[in-house]
Amino acid sequence: MANRAYLEQKQTQCSIINSSFSMTHRDLPTLTLSGKIRVMVTFFLFLVSTAFNASFLMKLQRQTQKKEEVKKLTRMKVLLKHLTLANLLETVIVMPLDGIWNVTVQWYAGEFLCKALSYLKLFSMYAPAFMMVVISLDRFLAITRPLAVKSNTKVGQSLIAVAWFLSIVLAGPQLYIFRMIYVEDISGQTGNFSQCVTHCSFPEWWQEAFYNLLTFSCLFIGPLLIMLVCNAKIIFTLTQVLHQDPHELQLNRSKNNIPRARLRTLKMTVAFATLFTICWTPYYVLGIWYWFDPEMLNRVSDPVNHFFFLFGLLNPCFDPLIYGYFSL
């Protein structure tokens, strides 16, 4: 992240004809020691996340293919299946792309893959964030509107479809704003260094700021606020129920409006929101800092930049552990 951000910061000329700009050789990004460590950790997390999420999907598949009869997954397990698919998508796209790009430093894959992979990267980051929102909304409705949810079995399916649709649409601008650029030496000759960046894609600075703010809001702030509101409302509703009839709840939870299994899924939903917040907050705080103060790259060390990004990659690795802990 730091190398490519630094490269865009150094862009001082814009040529739509040849998509090139001037830079001295010593300004070009290189693979540092901290970058090598980031690559190794990234591929390790790739293996861990792939193994964990694939194992959970296989477990769900076995549950639907019993010898006696084909069993239908519960609504919660369907939601978890889509979250796992989204996590796998993020794992197989974001992690290898980041690892390989940090090794090569520059972009060798051409204009088409520059746009396509930039689109897929953002799409695969939107999907798990939106799926966690869907799970929070589903649990919120299950507690506050249990009869309505039970009578309308398509609520969960509709929320899932909306989440995938928004992921596809909101990542669309990546196909336009990302492009390949080439570095010129001080004599004006185009060199051999190429990169995939958003150079000259926004005519006005406020347009880029607006797009960055929109992306940040949809990837982090929006999902986080929705999850917090849903979980707060759930806890408030549970507190009211416990205060209204605590004796009956203790004697027979299985017949209560909030059975033991539902309480377990609620705890899991809170765990998802907590993990999402812990993993991604450092990364996005660093991103906001860079938007308002690009010179921060000269003050924050490379190891710190790499660490914050790697912290975000822990999210798809730990989600399956949450499934396992709550024994769903």
UniProtKB/Swiss-Prot annotation:
It is found in: Cell membrane. PANTHER family: GONADOTROPIN-RELEASING HORMONE RECEPTOR, NEUROPEPTIDE RECEPTOR-RELATED G-PROTEIN COUPLED RECEPTOR. Glycans are attached at N18, N102, N192. Belongs to the G-protein coupled receptor 1 family. GO terms for molecular function: G protein-coupled receptor activity; peptide binding; protein-hormone receptor activity. This is Gonadotropin-releasing hormone receptor. Gene3D superfamilies: Rhodopsin 7-helix transmembrane proteins. It comes from Trichosurus vulpecula (Brush-tailed possum). Receptor for gonadotropin releasing hormone (GnRH) that mediates the action of GnRH to stimulate the secretion of the gonadotropic hormones luteinizing hormone (LH) and follicle-stimulating hormone (FSH). This receptor mediates its action by association with G-proteins that activate a phosphatidylinositol-calcium second messenger system. Disulfide bonds join C114-C196. Keywords: Cell membrane, Disulfide bond, G-protein coupled receptor, Glycoprotein, Membrane, Receptor, Transducer, Transmembrane, Transmembrane helix. Residues 59-77, 138-164, 233-281, 327-328 are cytoplasmic. GO terms for cellular component: plasma membrane. The keyword DNA repair does not apply. InterPro entries: GPCR_Rhodpsn, GPCR_Rhodpsn_7TM, GphnRH_fam_rcpt. It is a multi-pass membrane protein. The chain crosses the membrane at residues 39-58, 78-97, 116-137, 165-184, 213-232, 282-300, 307-326. Residues 1-38, 98-115, 185-212, 301-306 are extracellular. GO terms for biological process: cellular response to hormone stimulus.
